[in-house]
Amino acid sequence: MLRPAGLWRLCRRPWAARVPAENLGRREVTSGVSPRGSTSPRTLNIFDRDLKRKQKNWAARQPEPTKFDYLKEEVGSRIADRVYDIPRNFPLALDLGCGRGYIAQYLNKETIGKFFQADIAENALKNSSETEIPTVSVLADEEFLPFKENTFDLVVSSLSLHWVNDLPRALEQIHYILKPDGVFIGAMFGGDTLYELRCSLQLAETEREGGFSPHISPFTAVNDLGHLLGRAGFNTLTVDTDEIQVNYPGMFELMEDLQGMGESNCAWNRKALLHRDTMLAAAAVYREMYRNEDGSVPATYQIYYMIGWKYHESQARPAERGSATVSFGELGKINNLMPPGKKSQ
């Protein structure tokens, strides 16, 4: 399992986690139904969801789709680790935006009784990885879930929710289909993902064409996730961030892999085409600003992990205000009341 193991200085941030290298060929990884009472004031329309479905279907049809699975498999394994951290079994679970089954392959039938795998791309479902868990494939949009209230004990989602147009509503639907005391464990790309590529494209396009357009999709800020989860009804929240750095021979190899992952930009306001000279200039800027000692260039993927529980009366709750029997001012006296052998040193 890849884990952070150091620091790497970045051009516009004070630090970023670095991940131990693992040889992966030419790449080196270093690092339905709407819920009742939806509170979303309006439906945003940032992404072309039909284009995203086509991109994912195209990626799943490639002769060697596993060649581009390295990042999604790594994040899927980290989601599975978080599932195993919970000491219970889950009779019925859902993987939302499952792709080719990047989470299921790391789970076992002792932990998951039955696994529903839902995705917008039919080819991804047809070519999903094998698992020992009994599975059911469901062609479904993450924005419209075709499941009843209180259905699942566990919902997981890995690197899919950053493409939904209305994240608050999607989280509300996940909460809706969870059973009481059910848990949601998710991962999505964070705002600093591919900042090297974004910066290089902006600099080159500004110089060559007198301005720039967005070429990388917008991402949610980590400060918003806790609020969105709470507003959706989740409690006992956990939100943390991680970074995975992947080294590529150059910018064009990175962009080829993004296409192979099905992660190309699908925002409505994307610019369809950049001039060849602008692309070559961006590749030169990328190499000049971020090149490693071995000549490769890094790409940073920031990952937000989130965990939220659906309320159940058996869950621990904060004590009521004013119920404490000892004030902070009296904590220093507690040491005098303890037996001599147990006093703090």
Swiss-Prot record:
<dbReference type="GO" id="GO:0004497">
    <property type="term" value="F:monooxygenase activity"/>
</dbReference>
<comment type="function">
    <text>Arginine hydroxylase that mediates hydroxylation of 'Arg-111' of NDUFS7 and is involved in the assembly of mitochondrial NADH:ubiquinone oxidoreductase complex (complex I, MT-ND1) at early stages. May also have methyltransferase activity.</text>
</comment>
<comment type="similarity">
    <text>Belongs to the methyltransferase superfamily.</text>
</comment>
<protein>
    <recommendedName>
        <fullName>Arginine-hydroxylase NDUFAF5, mitochondrial</fullName>
        <ecNumber>1.-.-.-</ecNumber>
        <ecNumber>2.1.1.-</ecNumber>
    </recommendedName>
</protein>
<dbReference type="GO" id="GO:0032981">
    <property type="term" value="P:mitochondrial respiratory chain complex I assembly"/>
</dbReference>
<keyword id="KW-0999">Mitochondrion inner membrane</keyword>
<dbReference type="GO" id="GO:0008757">
    <property type="term" value="F:S-adenosylmethionine-dependent methyltransferase activity"/>
</dbReference>
<comment type="subunit">
    <text>Interacts with NDUFAF8, leading to stabilize NDUFAF5. Interacts with NDUFS7. Interacts with PYURF (via TRM112 domain); the interaction is direct and stabilizes NDUFAF5 protein.</text>
</comment>
<dbReference type="GO" id="GO:0099617">
    <property type="term" value="C:matrix side of mitochondrial inner membrane"/>
</dbReference>
<keyword id="KW-0431">Leigh syndrome</keyword>
<dbReference type="Pfam" id="PF08241">
    <property type="entry name" value="Methyltransf_11"/>
</dbReference>
<dbReference type="GO" id="GO:0032259">
    <property type="term" value="P:methylation"/>
</dbReference>
<keyword id="KW-0809">Transit peptide</keyword>
<dbReference type="GO" id="GO:0005743">
    <property type="term" value="C:mitochondrial inner membrane"/>
</dbReference>
<keyword id="KW-0225">Disease variant</keyword>
<keyword id="KW-0808">Transferase</keyword>
<dbReference type="GO" id="GO:0005739">
    <property type="term" value="C:mitochondrion"/>
</dbReference>
<keyword id="KW-0560">Oxidoreductase</keyword>
<dbReference type="InterPro" id="IPR013216">
    <property type="entry name" value="Methyltransf_11"/>
</dbReference>
<keyword id="KW-0472">Membrane</keyword>
<dbReference type="InterPro" id="IPR029063">
    <property type="entry name" value="SAM-dependent_MTases_sf"/>
</dbReference>
<keyword id="KW-1274">Primary mitochondrial disease</keyword>
<feature type="transit peptide" description="Mitochondrion">
    <location>
        <begin position="1"/>
        <end position="36"/>
    </location>
</feature>
<dbReference type="InterPro" id="IPR050602">
    <property type="entry name" value="Malonyl-ACP_OMT"/>
</dbReference>
<keyword id="KW-0496">Mitochondrion</keyword>
<keyword id="KW-0489">Methyltransferase</keyword>
